[in-house]
């Protein structure tokens, strides 16, 4: 029985656990649109299924009830419901309750209570006239029509808002009108003269918290009056050659002056500070005037005027040329905040509370327009970005003003909006070394910067190598690269950067040197120093042993043609031959000429031998005449061995023996003295030539026949005539 009951209850429990009741309506609000409807709204919460909402109302001070029904599938606004006329009357008290129902159940909101007077909302009033009041300055009168759909039994409250035509900021005025007051007008005072205003109006039941919508806007203008005043400023220029100084006067309408204020002209008068009697007056319709004042201080005054009167007098003191102005601004900076350019500064003079700000575009030529504005009781100044040109550099100066004196200005440059530079810097390469180079660049023209240059970045890379970069501040226009590779090509370029980005300049190529100037000078110095030392040593050696140096550089070659052997005759020749033994101790190198393998030397030797042969031939010719009478004749010639070269074998032909290029005269004379007088010239010549065997052994073996000799001079033996006397042969 128990199990049966449990099985029967299980589906019901599951269904109950899976049920999702609708969310409880919250934030109920009701508005009574006068003579139209009562509309209530609420927050439905999250819906998971079809939900129907029912608004239950109790009205007529609790005596009547009705409902307003809506659902999430059919109502355009599923969280709103309205009650319509004629079942809406004022005054009355209502109770409102919202009930939400879906397939899983019903849930109700809290009960809310409403007074219709407190939630009534009327139509907006209609403005039909805005006009100035004759004879009353700076005032306009607004007239409107009371809303038709407004409680007759209730007082209304109003809000009037107004602004100038060129302004976006509204000002508001609140006031109330009695339900019995038929004059629906309001006088708006404290306005600017000759200024056009925009007016709008709204109203509400005095007890209600709901305001009507704003009325349609209407425009009106205040009456014209005399000018409000002027602000005066000056631009001082350098003194001219005659001592007079040009001063440009600038003026504009005083702050707060009407935009439409009419001015017919300006009266200016000025005089030296030390003498008011020297006053000069000028009249102009322009907005500026240039005066040529002396070197002393001056006072300048001016007014503007129109048909209704004159403005208050504006005065300005012009300091003397030699007068020193005070300085109190310590630091100043500019920054961009949202859509404004903000300039801030710090002052060391606490008694200075008025400042004059001056700004103009930084262009190459003198600016045609200069803007200025005064600031009081503050150390900052702001200007809208749209009043300045983007990407243009502006010179901003702040002048401290204390009473009638103007202090030394503090100037900076600023951009209202910065961009990327239009072009990069022009780059050059200087002082190229082995491992170093200097990169120089020029500043970008002002018109191409589009911002304040904050830094420069140098990019450089070797061919096929890794790239490097160096960043320097904007005040540096050159940079030295170090640790480069010797004899390597590089590419380099410089990027100029602003706060908005950077732009690269032109890229250039360069190649490092193989040798530095120092290395070249060092090598040249070493070589030159070595040569200098060698020259010094050579000169010193030459001074110490001049003959030796001369002999080494220019060796003396004997010339047989200049020999004195031709002058040897008779006993002199014999006496010179007797010097043999004393000459034997002389070095062989002093008696002979060493052979040389070069063709030029051989030619010289050949010439010497020929000349010497001619000399001998002449000697034998002279002696033959005197020796014929002693000639034995008839004897057969025999071979005679060279008396001075016993080592030369007999039978050697003349061609096999070498030629000695030099025959000492004393030995030739000795041979001549031992020969018989009757010997034939040919025998004498052969006998005399056999004296050449005095040369060293190696010359005897390696000699070659000389074609210039009549007979071969290489022979080591010669024939003696058989007709020679016996004692002559023996002597030979």
From Swiss-Prot:
Signal peptide: 1-19
PTM: N-glycosylated.
Effect of residue 639 to A: No effect on STAT1 and STAT3 activation. Slight decrease
InterPro entries per UniProt: FN3_dom, FN3_sf, Ig-like_fold, Type1_Cytokine_Rcpt_Type2, TypeI_recpt_CBD
Effect of mutating residue 639 to F: Abrogates STAT5 activation. Mild effect on STAT1 activation. No effect on STAT3 activation
Topology relative to the membrane: Single-pass type I membrane protein
Induction / repression: Up-regulated in lesional keratinocytes of patients with atopic dermatitis. Up-regulated by IFNG/IFN-gamma. Up-regulated by bacterial lipopolysaccharides (LPS). Up-regulated by triacylated lipoprotein (Pam3Cys). Up-regulated by TGFB1/TGF-beta.
Impact when changing residue 708 to F: Abrogates STAT3 activation. Loss of interaction with STAT3. Mild effect on STAT1 activation. No effect on STAT5 activation
Keywords in alphabetical order: Amyloidosis, Cell membrane, Cell projection, Disease variant, Glycoprotein, Immunity, Membrane, Receptor, Repeat, Signal, Synapse, Transmembrane, Transmembrane helix
Transmembrane segments: 520-540
Documented effect of changing residue 670 to A: No effect on STAT1 and STAT3 activation. Slight decrease
Family label: Belongs to the type I cytokine receptor family. Type 2 subfamily.
Disease link: Amyloidosis, primary localized cutaneous, 2: A primary amyloidosis characterized by localized cutaneous amyloid deposition. This condition usually presents with itching (especially on the lower legs) and visible changes of skin hyperpigmentation and thickening that may be exacerbated by chronic scratching and rubbing. Primary localized cutaneous amyloidosis is often divided into macular and lichen subtypes although many affected individuals often show both variants coexisting.
The protein's role, per its UniProt record: Associates with OSMR to form the interleukin-31 receptor which activates STAT3 and to a lower extent STAT1 and STAT5. May function in skin immunity. Mediates IL31-induced itch, probably in a manner dependent on cation channels TRPA1 and TRPV1. Positively regulates numbers and cycling status of immature subsets of myeloid progenitor cells in bone marrow in vivo and enhances myeloid progenitor cell survival in vitro.
Protein name per Swiss-Prot or TrEMBL: Interleukin-31 receptor subunit alpha
Source organism: Homo sapiens
Gene: IL31RA
